[in-house]
Amino acid sequence: MYYEWPEASEAYAFRNQYLFGDDILVAPVTAPGKEGYATVKVWLPEGKWYEWQTGTMLDGGRTVERTFALDEYPVYVRAGAILPMYGDTVKNLNANDEEILLTLFPGGSGEFSLYEDNGDDKRYAAEFARTHLKSVRNGNLLTVTVGKRTGAYCGMPAERKFSVKVLASAAPASVTVDGAKADWTYLGEEFALVVEIPRTDCAAEKVVCIRYEDAEVD
């Protein structure tokens, strides 16, 4: 934490916390709990953060206290983050062409560089591919771009399907993928919007445009 916030005293005081990548804050439970529950104090740096378990957006610059069950994790995600995730069916990354779910945490624009290799040897330093992911919010328009894949590795898939999941979202007025009207699903219990990008060439850029009735949907 103190590498990212060297001038904040809390970064030194909360010694068990750490960042996983640029946008995920983890606060492990390190003390015994009672009857399957543990109370954890977490320091949230300045900015907006989403609690992973509940999807609640919290203001940073303060300490929060929360009780977690054994099957819950004190994990917080920075607002604006894009997190790519594989499905539950992935057994290994070699020649993996499974769908990738891009989960967006609203609160501003965000970027992510998706790195992939064959996951089966030591050539990862020289043989790999990257896909640039970007989300931009401008008024009532949210634009998500899946960039052209660059680089190469043995066995990489030529095509892939992506899905975009926007958390804390209202139902949209319209959705397009590469300029064409697209189907979408609204998960009312999660307040989340899901847009599927058809399986396409990984060397081609894909652009999702989500337009809302209201500019203030975050």
Question: What is the role of each PLM region?
Answer:
Residues 75, 177-180, 215-217:
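Exposed regions on extracellular, virion, or secretory-pathway luminal proteins
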Residues 178-203:
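Extracellular/luminal ectodomains and secreted, surface-exposed scaffolds of diverse proteins
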Residues 170-179, 204-211:
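A short amphipathic beta-strand at an alpha->beta junction
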Residues 57-59, 173-176, 180-184:
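Surface-exposed loop/edge segments in extracytoplasmic proteins
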Residues 76-78, 133, 184, 207-212:
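Short beta-strand element of the conserved SAM-dependent methyltransferase core
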